Regions:
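Conserved beta-alpha-beta core of the PfkB/ribokinase-like small-molecule kinase fold
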Residues: 124-168
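Short, basic, low-complexity termini and linkers enriched in Ser/Thr/Gly/Pro
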Residues: 1-5
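Short, acidic/turn-prone active-site loops that include or flank metal/cofactor-
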Residues: 36-38, 80-82, 153-157
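Proline/glycine-anchored alpha-helix kink/cap motifs
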Residues: 38-45
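Conserved N-terminal subdomain of the carbohydrate kinase-like
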Residues: 8-9, 19-31, 46-127, 140-145
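Active-site metal-binding loops of divalent metal-dependent hydrolases
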Residues: 15-17
Length: 168
């Protein structure tokens, strides 16, 4: 992809890199690479460089981080902590537009407190992937006036932190 001399700004994506178990009428995937920050960065990389800030557990397969790196995603700010990786389990019916959450296990994600490194604080585009809305707000306070920020959430946070979501 040519950029015709246009300087591309790095996108900062902060949030979930996970292991997902997904069941559809067409099959099931167990502990597949998942998470909002993962899916966002895999897509956004076609348009601009992406740096991911996330936490995974010591059980997170190294092949998943290797895949993200091969896609050109900066994973230098993905920390590996003692404990289990965030897991989500869901089910889709024939209408693949909506999922039913079967289980959410926060694990190391429950204590995730992202610190944005100086080289990422000037990011003009910030994607707040599926994380606690209070943490999303703390990330916004660490970056210097992004031109655009977007917030992803899910039923887990909508049910437990609705008031915090309104402040994002």
């Amino acid at each position: 992809m040519q950029n015709h001399g246009v300087k591309k700004n790095k996108i900062l994506a902060v949030g979930s890199v996970a292991l997902d178990t997904v069941k559809t009428p067409f099959g099931k995937a167990d502990e597949a690479l998942g998470g909002s920050a993962t899916f966002f960065s895999a897509s956004a990389r076609f348009f601009s460089p992406v740096s991911v800030v996330a936490v995974v557990g010591e059980d997170f397969p190294k092949k998943h981080l290797a895949l993200m790196k091969r896609l050109g995603v900066d994973t230098a700010n993905v920390s590996v902590e003692k404990g289990r990786t965030f897991r989500w389990s869901g089910e889709y019916n024939f209408d693949l537009n909506s999922a039913k959450t079967l289980k959410t296990e926060l694990n190391v994600f429950a204590t995730f407190k992202p610190v944005i490194r100086p080289e990422n604080r000037a990011s003009k585009v910030v994607f707040l992937a599926n994380i606690d809305p209070d943490i999303q707000q703390s990330v916004l306070k660490q970056v210097h006036k992004p031109s655009f920020s977007a917030c992803d959430t899910m039923n887990y946070w909508i049910g437990s932190k609705k008031q915090s979501l309104w402040r994002c």
